[in-house]
Amino acid sequence: MNIYRTHVCNELGVAHVGNEVALSGWVYRKRDHGGLLFVDLRDFYGITQLIFNESENPELFNRMATIGLESVITVRGIVAERSEDNVNASIETGHVEVKVSTLTVVSEAAPLPLHVPTSFSYPEDIRLQHRFLDLRCDKVKNSILLRSMVVSELRRAMEALGFIEVHTPILTSSSPEGARDYIVPSRTHAGKFYALPQAPQIFKQLLMVGGFDKYFQIAPCFRDEDSRADRSPGEFYQLDMEMSFVTQEDVFAAIEPVLYGLFAKFAGADKKVDRQFPRITYRDSMIRYGSDKPDLRNPLVISDVTEIFRNSGFRTFQAGVEAGEVVRAIPAPNTSGKPRSFFDDKIERAKEFGARGLGYVTYEADGTAKGPIAKFLSEDELARIRSAAGVGNGDSVFFMSDTADKAADFAGKIRELLGLELGLIEHDTFKFCWIVDFPYFKCEDGELDFCHNPFSMPQGEMEALEQQNPLDIIAYQYDIVCNGIEISSGAIRNHRLDVMYKAFSMVGYDEQTVNSKFGALVRAFKFGAPPHGGLAPGIDRIVMLLADAPNIREVICFPLNQTGEDLLMGAPSEVSPAHLQELSIALNIKRK
C-alpha cells in the first residue's frame, strides 16, 4: 500500500463518499471561514478541497493554519459530498471534499518569490531562477504537457508511415551550417575539439547511403545563436527525417498529412486548420508578401508596380527606377476616409523601419484619386495601379521604392502593420504554405556563398552549375511556414560527388578542403549513394504555435534566457584551473 496516497487529486467523486482516503500534494490555496479552514490540495493531476474543523480538532486546525502555501502535505480523512450551493464545477472533484483527520507535513515551503497561480505574469528572470515553482502553474505546466503529447503523436505518425527511429551522435565534428558551433574540448586528444551538432545533417545522409530507407528522430540541435521570439539560444528539438529514392513531391506528400493531422488534433475547438499547403516560390513570396515567411492569415498582397512608374511624372520614383530600384504597392482596404494622421503614422513607421519614406494614393468613394503623389500620375497610371493592387473605391495604396531587397523588407513590414491595425488577420486559423525554389547561391561583398543548405541539389545539377549565372541557379530547397513562422526547412540532397565538388569550388572550397571537412560524406558517396531528401519540422516552434505562446521559451521546460544564461543552474559557469589544465586549455578572455 502506498503510504502517501490512495488516490490522486482529480480522482474523487460522489462514488467515494464515506470512504477514508489518503492524499498528498501541495497547499494551493487556503480560506479561513471562521472555524472552518478550506484548503485546496493540488498535485499533478488536479485539485481536491480539504476541510479542517476547529471545533472538532482545534490542534489540527491550528497546525494547518500555520502551514505556508506550496508546502507538501499528506492527509487522511473521510470523503463528504458538498452541498449543492458549494459545488465547484470548474474542477473534477468539485462535488466532494475531504474532512481531514490526520495531517503530516512532508516538506514545508519557505516564503514564496512568486505567486504560483499567476507566475507567468512575473518578470522572466524571477520565473527562470525559480523554474521549479513556475512549472507548478497550470498555464506553464499545460504547455509542457502539450509538448509531450505533440512529440508522442509525431513519433506515432512517423512509425505508421514506416520510418525507423535512429539516434545519431551528439559529439561530432564541426560543419558549416550557417551558425556558430558549441565546441567541446577533448581530454584525450589535446588541442582538438568535438562540436555539438547543429543538426544531424550528415549523419542522416550517411544513413541513406547505409541502406536505410526512411529515418526519423526527435533530434536535439545546438546552435550558438542570438535569441528571438521564435528562436531559443543554445538548443532546440526537431522532427528530423530523411527518405531514400524520393523527389521533392514525395517529401511533400509524406509530411503534409502528418502536420495537418497534428495541428487538427491539438489546435483546440476555437482554432481552424487550413488543409491546404499552397506552394509559393521564393521570388513570388518576396514580391507578394515581402518575406520568405509569409503569414497567409493576412489577406493583403503586395504588387510590383515598377513599370508603371518608369516613365511617370513622379520624379522621385522615376529616378529610382532608372537607377535600378523597384516600386512595391501595398493595398489598404477601406481607408480612403481615414484622417491624415493615419497616413502620416504609416510614413513615420516606415522611417522607423529604415525606409526613406512612404508614398500613398487614396481612391475616394466616387473613384477620384487623391493623395500627395496622385497629382503626378496620369489617369491611365492611376487606373493601372488600381488594377495591379486589386483595390477599388474607398481603398488606398501605399508605395515603397528602394532596392529590391530593401523594398521587399519594408513593404512586408507595412503589410504586416496594416493587417494588424485594420483587423484583417484571421487569428482563429492556422495556415500553412511551402516556400520553394530558393536561390542556390547568394553574393555578399562580392563573394559567392551558399544561400541556405550547402548539401542540397541544384535544379539542373551539373548542367546548371556549368552553364547558368550562379545567382540564377535554383535549389531543391523548401520551407514550411505556418502563420508567418518558419516551422521546417528541407531539401533534396546532392548525392553526386562531382556536383558537390563543383558547387563547393564555386564558393572557394577546393577538393582537398571538401575532403577534409566532409570526409565521411565524400567517402560514402564513392560507394553508391541513392537520391535522397528530407526536412526537419521544429518541435519548439510547432508547440509555441499550438499553445499560442508569446515566445518559444514558454514551451521549453528549462530554457535559457534571452542572453543564453541558465539562471536556475548558473550556466555558463567558470571551471577550475585544474580542469582547464587537464584539457590543455589556456584562457585568453577578450575584455569588452
From Swiss-Prot:
- Give the UniProt entry's GO cellular component terms: cytoplasm
Question: Quick one: where's region Aspartate?
Answer: 201-204
Main localization of the protein?
cytoplasm
Q: Which residues bind ATP?
A: 223-225, 486, 538-541
The record's PROSITE patterns line, in alphabetical order, gives: AA_TRNA_LIGASE_II (PS50862)
* Root EC class: ligase
Provide the reaction this enzyme catalyses.
tRNA(Asx) + L-aspartate + ATP = L-aspartyl-tRNA(Asx) + AMP + diphosphate
- Superkingdom of this protein's organism: Bacteria
Enzyme Commission number(s): 6.1.1.23
> For the site Important for tRNA non-discrimination, which positions are given?
33
- What functional role does this protein have? Aspartyl-tRNA synthetase with relaxed tRNA specificity since it is able to aspartylate not only its cognate tRNA(Asp) but also tRNA(Asn). Reaction proceeds in two steps: L-aspartate is first activated by ATP to form Asp-AMP and then transferred to the acceptor end of tRNA(Asp/Asn).
What do we know about how this protein assembles, alone or with others?
Answer: Homodimer.
Cross-referenced PANTHER family:
ASPARTATE--TRNA LIGASE, MITOCHONDRIAL, ASPARTYL/LYSYL-TRNA SYNTHETASE
Q: Which family does it belong to?
A: Belongs to the class-II aminoacyl-tRNA synthetase family. Type 1 subfamily.
Q: What is the protein's given name?
A: Aspartate--tRNA(Asp/Asn) ligase
What species does this protein belong to? Anaplasma marginale (strain Florida)
